[in-house]
A protein has these predicted regions:
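Canonical Rossmann dinucleotide-binding motif of NAD(H)/NADP(H)-dependent dehydrogenases/reductases
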Residues: 2-34
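Conserved NAD(P)H cofactor-binding loop of Rossmann-fold oxidoreductase domains
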Residues: 84-89
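Substrate-binding pocket helix/loop in short-chain dehydrogenase/reductase
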Residues: 92-93, 100-105
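Residue(s) in the substrate-gating loop at a strand-loop-helix junction
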Residues: 136
Length: 138
C-alpha cells in the first residue's frame, strides 16, 4: 500500500514534464490519477499509469467544470488537485498582443483558482484534501 492508496488525484498539464512526473509519482504511491492536458499525448501517460485522461483547454470555463465533474465520477473521489498547467506569453512585453496576454492570465491565474474551487467542493465530500499550485513554465 502506498502513501496515497485509494486517493483521487487530479493533475493539470499531465502530458509531459513536471506534470507527467507528478502523475507518475502519485500513481506509484497507489493514487487514482486523472490528468488533463491540451495535448492528446496525455492519454498515453494516463494509460501507462492506469489513470484517466481528459483533453481540456483550461482557457474554457466549461471544460474546466467538465474535467472536475467527470474526473470525480471516474475516480470516485477527489483528495488532491495539482494545478500544474501553464503557458508562456509569446514574445516580450513590448510585442505580446492583448488577446494573447488574456489567454496567459486565463490559463495561469483564473483556471487554477476556478479548478481549486471546483475541486474543494469535491474534497469536502470526503472530509478534506490538498491543493498544490506549481509555478513553472517550460
Amino acid at each position: 500500500m502506498g502513501l496515497f492508496a485509494g486517493k483521487g488525484v487530479l493533475v493539470t498539464g499531465g502530458a509531459r514534464g513536471i506534470g507527467r512526473a507528478i502523475a507518475q509519482a502519485f500513481a506509484r504511491e497507489g493514487a487514482l490519477v486523472a490528468l488533463c492536458d491540451l495535448r492528446p499525448e496525455g492519454k498515453e501517460v494516463a494509460e501507462a499509469i492506469g489513470g484517466a485522461f481528459f483533453q481540456v483547454d483550461l482557457e474554457d470555463e466549461r471544460e474546466r467544470v467538465r474535467f472536475v465533474e467527470e474526473a470525480a465520477y471516474a475516480l470516485g473521489r477527489v483528495d488532491v488537485l495539482v494545478n500544474n498547467a501553464a503557458i508562456a506569453a509569446p514574445g516580450s512585453a513590448l510585442t505580446v498582443r492583448l488577446p494573447e496576454w488574456r489567454r496567459v492570465l486565463e490559463v495561469n491565474l483564473t483556471a487554477p483558482m476556478h479548478l481549486s474551487a471546483l475541486a474543494a467542493r469535491e474534497m469536502r465530500k470526503v472530509g478534506g484534501g490538498a491543493i498544490v499550485n506549481v509555478a513553472s513554465v517550460q
